[in-house]
Amino acid sequence: RPQREKGYSYSFDMLGEAALTQDDAEKYMADYRLAIDTVGKEPQVGPGPRPSISIKLSALHPRYEVAQRERVLTELFANVLELASRARALDVGISIDAEEADRLELSLELYEKLLRAPALQGWGEIGLVVQAYSKRCLPVLVWLTLLGKELGAKMPLRLVKGAYWDTEIKYAQQQGLDNYPVFTRKEGTDTSYLACARYLLSEHTRGVIYPQFASHNAHTVSCVLALAAEAKTPRDFEFQRLHGMGDALYDTVIEQHQQTVRIYAPVGAHKDLLPYLVRRLLENGANSSFVHQLVDPGVPVESLIDHPVTQLRKFASLANDKIPLPPALFSPARKNSQGLNMNISAAMQAL
């Protein structure tokens, strides 16, 4: 409540990992129903927008995978539609969290089906999370914009840098894929984030996408504010931060820029917190992380405020040469066994 009185809003994340059984999925479904009902009954506090709920699709179906596409687009769709309809009735926004790259196309297909559902027409409060470390991030944003224009829909869109980087790298190596689905340099991800932010604040998305920029990097936040001023879209977007992080940074943003800021807050039992906490530590505790470098006395301030494009230009290639491509993982001893990602439509079409 004190944070909301200061101007913050919230997005509540019900803790829990991917459902392995139908019982798991039903438990998470009940948790989401309760969360929506609880938030919906709370009176509005402070000047910020009403709190929202973040939904993890893999928690709502034990077979959330491309091989089970038909089941996903019927059974999982029905679950999410029920939650979204319930949320609409109680004026609680819904945001669908991003997960691994393998599930991206399937999640977009399901999201499109939700936007086309008669029960959700004209709502404008069912959002999506997109990851800037993905090489497909900008094309996804363009596709979503065209979809929104076709349907006359407005969608909240949370832009994050991504929390599954280690998983994506290791999976691509284990499967012997041709390349990685994510940028292998942090500077590449930071540059992608700013390129996507520029697009989201441009006239192309106006009236279609409501941008939500999630970051704890002070340079990124400053760049977004500058891009918004340049695009003449002041305050027609919001920032987001994790609970317990970025307090001083975003207190300043609210005070000096009167900008909406939403706190992403985990909710659940202690036993469910560990996987979430590990992802946050991997994301923000890496040596290259802004948050990590900020408290390192050996890192000069100049390097913290250096533009990521400037940093990226110092390298000979966009790819990190210290992370060999999956086929060359065991070079020079031998070539890695080759695999094919059947969850990506482009790979399937090439067969």
Model-derived segments and spans:
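Positively charged, amphipathic and often flexible ligand-engagement surfaces
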Residues: 1-338
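Alpha-helical bundle segments enriched in helix-capping/polar residues
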Residues: 337, 341-345
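Short, intrinsically disordered, charge-balanced linker/junction segments flanking boundaries
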Residues: 345-351
